[in-house]
Amino acid sequence: MAIVLPSCGQKNNKKAQVADENASVVYFTKDISPDGLIKIYEALGVEAKGRVAVKISTGESMLSNHLRPELIGPLVKKVNANLVECNTAYAGNRQQTADHWKAIEEHGYTAIATVDIMDEEGEMKIPVKDDKWIKYDIVGSHLQNYDFMINLAHFKGHAMGGFGGVLKNASIGVASRNGKTYIHTAGKAEDYNQLWQNLPEGWMNSPENDTPFIESMSAAAQAVHEYFKGRNGIVYIDVMNNISIDCDCDGNPHEPTIQDIGIAASLDPVALDKFCLDQVFNLPNDENNDTKALLERINQRHGTHIVYRGEEAGLGTTKYTVVEL
């Protein structure tokens, strides 16, 4: 069960009061601004050292709800990072490198930082601990050029995963386009041209049928976590704004029906995504928040299972303590 410690009267106390020794700390602010983003990163107390990557979604189109350059630019500059992304497995504006570069420039990212499409020159395999479905994780080869990662995710819905947060950003996001296929097909195919005919059977029909994909995402996220744990580290940030039922990989997403919530960060990706899920599930369904469609999508796709699978595999814990800034 999630533990939430109220911050009333404790605005200046940045130290977590952990009520459960097994709980992870999640930092939270309602300030969705460049300054708020920097402050929540600093609250984590981990210095970005060496060659730093900030992993984002570059967004399928300007209609997508991806994180805008003006929001993330000051943080990226502060840590002297490259923005990193990989090509997509599905046909669209970002499957082919030349098209992806065009989208990156149109979306304004090259104006704020050096951008690296990590699978532009190939891919590599990194080990997984949870090998139930996938036996390795196929990531962009440029991942080896980085010592530290800030996983900067936009929390939203997703057509296949139910929702997308830092776990999806670490798994599908860091995977090459062939790696994305490998995860989506739960180990059945590695060629992005073979994606659609190898998806888990009946994945749209029941939450259970989508489980192989969900568990493969968890395994891939853990692989990336362990990779950077063996280097200088990795931290996780979820931005809860413009929350649509559709992912930023959708070029024509449904309009957001939920008010902006805030920014959350943690060293534990499982606890962080669980916190964000709890925020959405606990919202009142009223004139300010129409949560019905998003919650239905998450439940239909067995979306919440990813945090429990991650916990079972040792990636993190679903127990958390909140420190509000």
Question: In which residue ranges do the predicted regions lie?
Answer:
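Bacterial signal peptide processing site
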Residues: 9-11
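C-terminal motif of bacterial Sec signal peptides marking the signal peptidase cleavage site
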Residues: 4-7
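Extended, low-polarity segments enriched in aliphatic/aromatic residues
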Residues: 18-325
